Amino acid sequence: MVCHVFSSFSSSLIRVLEAPLLLPAASASSSSSSSPASRSGGRRRRAAHVRPSPAIYPGRQELASHSSMLPTDFDIKVLIERHEALTDDVQEMLQHQRRRHQKTASGGRERIATVDHLRRLCMDHYFQDEVDDAMDACLLEELAHGGDLLDATLAFRLMREAGHHVSADEVLGRFTDDNGEFRLDYRKDIRGLLSLQDISHMNIGQEASLCKAKEFSTRNLESAINYLEPNLARYVRQSLDHPYHVSLNQYKARHHLSYLQTLPIRCTAMEELALADFQLNKLLHQMEMQEIKRWWMDLGLAQEIPVARDQVQKWFVWMMTAIQGASLSRCRIELTKIVSFVYIVDDIFDLVGTREELSCFTQAIRMWDLAAADSLPSCMRSCFRALHTVTNDIADMVEREHGVNPINHLKKAWAMLFDGFMTETKWLSAGQVPDSEEYLRNGVVTSGVPLVFVHLLFMLGHDVSQNAAEFVDHIPPVISCPAKILRLWDDLGSAKDEAQEGLDGSYKELYLKENPGLAAGEAEEHVRRLIAGEWEELNRECFSASPSRSSPATTFPAGFTQAALNAARMVGVMYGYDGERRLPVLDDYVRMLLF
């Protein structure tokens, strides 16, 4: 296992350093750009949202200067060797705990606690055999129904994450009074309250005990911060601001490590391995970012479509956070290119094309024929050539690695995205106001989430040839949930992020039109309830060991559902604007995970 870990890291780093860039057959030309102001019939809906904040999305000079800071091959070799040695140390510790567990009952609790630390540090996959052995179902069941709040809630979380059926009401009922309220003697159990707060976000719907758990733990942790010692107070504050289940684990891991380093009893090997792991992952992501940056600069679309968003770092952050693991480096790079085209095509529809041009653009995509785009403006032809090349390259890569060529399914996914954008264009040009539910259904498609995840599904080697058409036509909940969460969050932040001319709609705006007696705050609260409902549905999909009830014939690999969950976790970060129209949490994520 250890050798596999390091060969995965080293081979991924070498591939990023040496792999040739997958460039389009012809780069876009900046000399033939088309100004949206000169295009008759064009409707500018997002004219103020054409350039990102430099504080969050550094420009080319900043990114170029950063590339000179990358370590040498010798530095990489030293990092990998240290990671290998520390992994051996932690593995030896886990084996020692296993032997102790065989002798004493308390050893089981120690092993479960270690598994929790490894998961919070995003390192459990290096020790999968040991983790599986420690996750004894009988022990977890015993702890979940015991009388210790920390043990019970931790066991509940681990069991639910593993797909086991476990009742929140049964587990938490032991800690409530006759009225179903949590007993007051748990108000001072800080670690128990933190664990209770963790599981309160794992609601799969109609779990009243978890709603009460969230209210009870939040209220008492907030009041406890004032008297806790500083290190624990910071950890509690961070846990409340960024709840474990709905936050990116990579980000939480850094804060968990900082907390572990303040404890009187420490596991030095595990802490040092976490630091080495952070360094290697950051290095790998920096190299991936450099390759994507080179591809984007050589492509030339930023010069040809100057009003379009030029946010290479933002596009990469989506994939960096959703798809984890050194072995999936190439997957992150190629899917970042797909994400970039979603943004560029959105801007072409919003800012550049007339309805007639966009209709022809959509038809060319349906035909998947470059010649069909000959009559289009230069920027559209260049965009089509680029996305056509990248998509075909991905299909060829999937065929080489997995023996299936998914190009027909990928073409259909692209056509679905363009049809969704075309629907919005028709609404706008005709002055038509869709109802909120119709808007949201189309918004799932135009979010780009289904398109990206269709590509991901095939790149992971999952053969859905029997039902891929159904996957595209009837988007499964594991994809529609993060897509709806993204669309609704985006709409909540659109007033801060965009200055729109005309009504291309937001769910909140349309809902207010349908309910004229509501105040804006009530409509926003309705949207937040919808987001919470989508999280509950996504939890059901991710925590169920059986196929989805909505699509019983379809099961997805664990890496796929984890990516969907991570995408949902990142939405609030990507659209969490503060009062000054900044994204401070995203800035913190990027600084911590990439630079």
UniProtKB/Swiss-Prot annotation:
Per the entry, induction is:
By jasmonate.
Annotated residues that bind Mg(2+) 3 are located at D490, S494, E498
**Catalytic activity, reaction form:** (2E)-geranyl diphosphate + H2O = (S)-linalool + diphosphate
**UniProt pathway:** Secondary metabolite biosynthesis; terpenoid biosynthesis
Molecular function (GO) terms for this protein are:
magnesium ion binding; S-linalool synthase activity; terpene synthase activity
- Compartments reported by the entry: Plastid, Chloroplast
Annotated segments matching region Disordered: 27-54
Q: What residue spans carry the Low complexity bias annotation?
A: 27-40
Annotated family: Belongs to the terpene synthase family. Tpsb subfamily.
Q: What's the protein here called?
A: S-(+)-linalool synthase, chloroplastic
Give the gene that encodes this protein: LIS
